[in-house]
A protein has these predicted regions:
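Exported/periplasmic cell-wall-interacting domains
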Residues: 23-28, 33-107
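Cell wall/extracellular polymer interaction/catalysis modules
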Residues: 1-28
Length: 107
């Protein structure tokens, strides 16, 4: 995550589960809003998160306290439903420095 041209956060994440067809959709988006202490709800999950920053429909950047491993090929078999799961300390730093409208590039 860059702010004012300076790198603030460089972290491993887990994106959408490729093998289940939940890939995080590639594209250029913008942060829609940010919310503390949200509960993310889907057909088969309800996950409380401390830092929620959606950028496309119900897809966003958030902490994932239930995860112990981030990065690498984790997304292939143990990925998210499309969100960008981020270690809590890094999600907090992003949350505290990001604003509505900031571009998000997913590739």
């Amino acid at each position: 995550f860059y702010k004012n041209g300076q790198l603030l956060v460089d972290t491993d994440v887990v994106t959408g589960n490729h093998n289940l067809g939940h890939d995080t959709k590639t594209g250029i988006y913008a942060i829609m809003y940010k919310e503390r202490n949200a509960t993310l709800v889907g057909e088969d999950y309800s996950s409380p998160v401390k830092y929620w920053m959606p950028f496309y429909a119900n897809v966003g950047i958030h902490d994932a306290s239930w995860r112990t491993t981030f990065g690498g090929s984790e997304y292939l078999n143990n990925g998210s439903h499309g969100c960008v799961n981020t270690p809590e300390a890094n999600a907090e730093k992003i949350f505290n420095n990001i604003e509505k409208g900031v571009p998000v590039v997913v590739y």
